[in-house]
């Protein structure tokens, strides 16, 4: 899937990719913000459907190609590792930049459905002998059922959507900024992943570790760049919509598409005992951290301290990964 490249060229890809990533993320979020205001669409819906699904395109491409190549652990590691990275690292960093307002419809609607999607994906992977094509079809069917419910629930909470609106958007060509920015986000993330995988291969690390760390983080760079740009603009619904939409897409559409193309076999037991439980717990933590315990039906806030907890949890998970995967089988 990835070809070996000289170390100097890999470093150039990383530097150029980082610069293009930062520039295109700002254009991408600016275009999405302008379009949502012009069409009167709630920012959370734009964040989930356009930004969340759009920035998950790298995960879909990498997992599908990994499945075709027979690399089941790389495919699942990419999808589930991206979900862990999205919450623990990206939401954590975004909350450290600015506390994130959380509407009740997110706590009681979007997050429980994301949790259901995550648990369903886990059960299909854990039960039976591997992950069959029919399991992939079930994932895609559940994705098709839950997607309209997400948008419907946000329509119920639309009345308080303006609570998290930031400064007015100014973008002369919003659609060009949106789709052009998305294309550059995806392209620049591939430059970064390409170089990172080449360096990891030289170090001789395991396929699962590459999928859970380098490729998962690399394909999540569009989400990270978009979340930071959204947080700086005060578009907090974009931040939450981005992460929830991306994780929903990864858990069902990415895993389902990859499994439907090529069934997963010889799945590492670490995915069952370590990665899936951590992904589910992190998903649940979004609702716990964002709930207003004094007034549950009022808007809550994810404070900076919770962002710090997420980042520390990700560092601990990363340490555990490196320690376990470095041990001989």
Per-range role (PLM):
Residues 1-329:
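Hydrophobic alpha-helical segments, chiefly the membrane-spanning helices
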């Amino acid at each position: 899937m990835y070809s070996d490249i000289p170390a100097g060229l890999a470093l150039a890809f990383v530097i150029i990719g980082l610069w293009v990533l930062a520039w295109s993320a700002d254009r991408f979020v600016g275009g999405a913000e302008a379009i949502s205001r012009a069409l009167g669409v709630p920012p959370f819906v734009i964040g989930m459907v356009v930004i969340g699904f759009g920035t998950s395109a790298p995960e879909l491409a990498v997992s599908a190609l990994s499945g075709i190549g027979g690399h089941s652990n790389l495919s699942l590691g990419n999808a589930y590792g991206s979900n862990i990275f999205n919450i623990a690292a990206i939401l954590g960093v975004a909350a450290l930049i600015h506390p994130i307002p959380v509407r009740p419809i997110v706590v009681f609607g979007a997050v429980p459905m994301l949790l259901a999607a995550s648990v369903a994906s886990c059960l299909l992977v854990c039960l039976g002998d591997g992950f069959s094509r029919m399991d992939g079809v079930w994932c895609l069917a559940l994705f098709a059922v839950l997607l309209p419910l997400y948008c419907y629930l946000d329509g119920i909470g639309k009345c308080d959507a303006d609570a998290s609106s930031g400064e007015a958007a100014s973008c002369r060509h919003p659609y060009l900024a949106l789709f052009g920015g998305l294309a550059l986000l995806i392209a620049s993330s591939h430059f970064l992943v390409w170089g990172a995988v080449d360096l990891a291969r030289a170090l001789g690390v395991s396929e699962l570790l590459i999928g859970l760390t380098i490729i998962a983080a690399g394909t999540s760079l569009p989400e990270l760049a978009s979340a930071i740009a959204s947080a700086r603009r005060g578009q907090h619904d974009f931040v939450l919509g981005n992460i929830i939409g991306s994780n929903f897409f990864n858990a069902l559409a990415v895993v389902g598409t990859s499994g439907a193309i090529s069934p997963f076999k010889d799945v590492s037991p670490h995915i069952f005992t370590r990665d899936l439980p951590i992904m589910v717990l992190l998903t649940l933590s979004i609702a716990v951290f964002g709930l207003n315990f004094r007034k549950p039906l009022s808007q809550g806030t994810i404070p900076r301290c919770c962002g710090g907890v997420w980042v520390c949890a990700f560092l601990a998970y990363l340490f555990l990964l490196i320690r376990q995967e470095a041990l001989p089988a």
